[in-house]
Swiss-Prot record:
Native species: Dichelobacter nodosus (strain VCS1703A)
Keywords of this entry: Aminoacyl-tRNA synthetase, ATP-binding, Cytoplasm, Ligase, Metal-binding, Nucleotide-binding, Protein biosynthesis, RNA-binding, tRNA-binding, Zinc
Name recorded for this polypeptide: Threonine--tRNA ligase
Family annotation (Gene3D superfamilies): 3.10.20.30, 3.30.54.20, Anticodon-binding domain, Bira Bifunctional Protein, Domain 2, Threonyl-trna Synthetase, Chain A, domain 2
Record text on subunit structure and interactions: Homodimer.
TGS domain span: 1-61
């Protein structure tokens, strides 16, 4: 006779075991109609699952984030249902939920095309419109294996074979003639699926292993309503216009090519942006007391084994063998910084010691995940490592957070979200060390009144971390900065200092990156500003154009004045109409377009126009220089 406690504290008693659907019906018909799943304690379950004991119960609808995630997961099953009707020989692999939607990996001889997606989506719409019921059956593992063997679903069988020995049953979901396997929960019927769209195709591999079977991945998005879907698609259309790959090509910033997958060829203009950011960060490093260092590109396997990276990260490392020794190209900079710290015994009076490096890192990311300069194999990280005593941790974390916010503000990101990621299953170090590390980060955030959300299990293998996520002009979120507390690696690599009592102690190591990788951050900036970079970041800050050849000497002299003032100015002496030049440099997103004719030459002035088409009139050269210098020095997002 279970007693159910509802979110408002009210209780309901039942004479026998009861399902989530029956509980919803006992509360009201409208809730029963809207119900998608049920939360029992902390666990989400299907409405058809029975509850035999006393429990805290919440009915989940599409108004809950969990409900929307369930809708998206069920859309993946709907995709499988429709696809097997259209291409019966295809083999279904996995279909998880991702941000805003879902995907399904498929093995098939047929090569899917964008035209196929339209056909597949239409079949999904027809199936969803019937509102058919989804049936769940708990099935013995052996029987589930037989079912998928009969259906020639080889990958489902492999998944079953990977189950732990104590797993006796598996949840099978029946979508009419289609069967899928999942932990669930899922919607009780297709009437709950109201708005979805298939979006793109890509390649993938079984378990992400490039040596395993090649698969095809179909992506989709799903929302609560058609309006939410339409809003999302409108946003995506705007994001498409801002695609950093397209803008990077149009503005001659960089390129990528097959001979160097995941590695960027920086052109002069793109490299100007890169170096401007690097130089800006150096000013912050000096302000906050960092020593800039540089470590080797490759290190012996033995060091990576000591640090724990070989065991936890080995599959993503590029390796080589030299003189019968295994080496790895560094995927991160921290072990190298410990080696620098270890040169000469340190005193507590020297702490904290703050190292920074624009470290070139390489990670063997799967080819299917590479994306422009946002996801690459060779990148530079604005890495920093602070070695300090335990009683200095809180102050250093607070200083680092101030530095992070200062940097983001200068780049125009005002909306920053924080998350505290705690210990993962695979980790190094004792629980006591993790307790202290997690507590240290949380107290530092609370001391600064910084709001954050907890992300259990998402920390690095060597310590918990604070993650800084930027929200851009389209409302998209980009996780960039991290601050990670590490009590483990310094001990593993023999880092020590002498305390005030003359005893050897192991320092605490704080890992921090603000921009993340410079490549990815530049990609974010390009999309944030749609290529219209703030003046201080613009590769060319002013383009000076003579109306005729008779004004060429004048503009050349003017350009030298701009350059002497530290402004990146160029001149366009081509024999083209001035209107043509203005249009071309407007498309190149040059902030200031400066024109010189007879009037300007005689009065030692320039006619000023901005890239957004605003005419600022005729201005004296000194005034223009002063204005542009002010915009550069203040890191202004404006150009007027």
């Amino acid at each position: 006779m279970p007693t159910i406690t509802l979110p408002d504290g009210s209780k309901k008693s039942f004479n026998a075991a009861i399902t989530g659907q029956e509980i919803a019906e006992s509360i009201g018909s409208s809730l029963a109609k809207a119900a998608i799943a049920v939360r029992i304690g902390e666990k989400l379950q299907d409405l058809s699952d029975t509850i035999a004991c006393d429990a805290d119960v919440t009915i989940i609808t599409d108004k809950d984030e969990a409900g929307l995630e369930i809708i998206r997961h069920s859309c993946a099953h709907l995709l499988g249902h429709a696809l097997k009707q259209l291409w019966p020989q295809a083999k279904m692999v996995i279909g998880p939920v991702i941000e805003n939607g879902f995907y399904y990996d498929i093995e098939a001889d047929h090569r899917f095309t964008p035209e196929d997606l339209a056909v597949l989506e239409e079949r999904m719409q027809k199936l969803a419109a019937t509102g058919y019921s989804v049936k769940k059956e708990w099935t013995p593992v052996a029987r589930a294996r037989e079912i998928f063997h009969e259906r020639q679903e080889d990958f489902k069988i492999r998944l079953i074979d990977d189950f732990d020995a104590d797993v006796k049953e598996v949840g099978l979901y029946y979508h009419q003639e289609y069967v899928d396997m999942c932990r669930g929960p899922h919607v009780p019927d297709m009437g709950k699926i109201k708005a979805f769209k298939l979006t793109k195709l890509s390649g993938s591999y079984w378990r992400g292993d490039a040596q395993a079977e090649a698969l095809q991945r179909i992506y989709g998005v799903a929302f609560r309503s058609k309006k939410e879907l339409d809003d999302y698609l409108t946003q995506q259309a705007e994001a498409e216009k801002r695609d950093h790959r397209k803008i990077g090509k149009a503005l001659d910033l960089f390129h990528l090519q097959e001979e160097a997958p995941g590695m960027v060829f920086w052109h002069a203009k793109g490299w100007t942006i890169y170096r401007e950011i690097e130089n800006y960060m150096r000013t912050k490093l000096r302000k906050y007391g960092y020593q800039e260092v540089q470590g080797p590109q490759i290190l012996d396997r033995s060091l990576w084994e000591k640090s724990g990276h070989w065991d936890k990260f080995g599959g993503n490392m590029f390796t080589c063998c030299i003189d019968n020794h295994d080496f790895a190209v560094k995927p991160m900079n921290c072990p190298g910084h410990v080696q620098i710290f270890n040169q000469g015994l340190k005193s507590y009076r020297e702490l904290p010691i703050r190292y920074a490096e624009f470290g070139i890192c390489h990670r063997n990311e799967p080819s299917g995940t590479l994306h422009g300069i946002m996801r690459v194999r060779r990148f530079v990280q604005d890495d920093g490592h602070i070695f300090c005593a335990r009683n200095q941790v809180r102050v250093e974390i607070e200083r680092t957070c101030r530095m992070v916010y200062e940097v983001y503000d200068d780049f125009g990101f005002k909306n920053v979200e924080l998350a505290l990621s705690t210990r993962p299953e695979k980790r190094v170090g004792s629980d006591e060390i993790w307790d202290e590390a997690e507590r240290g980060l949380q107290e530092a955030l609370e001391a600064q009144n910084l709001a954050f959300r907890l992300q259990p299990g998402e920390g690095a293998f060597y310590g918990p971390k604070i993650e800084f996520t930027l929200k851009d002009s389209l409302g998209r979120r980009w996780q960039c900065g991290t601050v990670q507390l590490d009590f483990s690696m310094p001990a593993r690599l023999g880092a020590e200092y002498i305390d005030e009592h003359g005893e050897k102690q192991t320092p605490v190591m704080i890992h921090r990156a603000i921009l993340g990788s410079l490549e990815r951050f530049i990609g974010i900036l390009i999309e944030q500003y749609a290529g219209n970079m703030p003046v201080w970041l613009s590769p060319v800050q002013a383009m000076i154009m003579p109306i005729t050849d008779t004004h060429a000497d004048y503009v050349q002299n003017v350009m030298q004045k701009f350059i002497a003032a530290g402004i990146r100015a160029e001149i366009d002496l081509r024999n083209e109409k001035i209107s043509y030049k203005i249009r071309e440099h407007t498309l190149q997103r040059v902030p200031f377009l400066l024109v010189a004719g007879d009037r300007e030459k005689q009065s030692n002035t320039l006619s000023v126009r901005t890239r957004d088409g605003k005419e600022l009139g005729v201005m004296e050269i000194a005034t223009i220089i002063e204005h542009i210098r002010h915009l550069i020095e203040t890191k202004s997002q404006e150009i007027e």
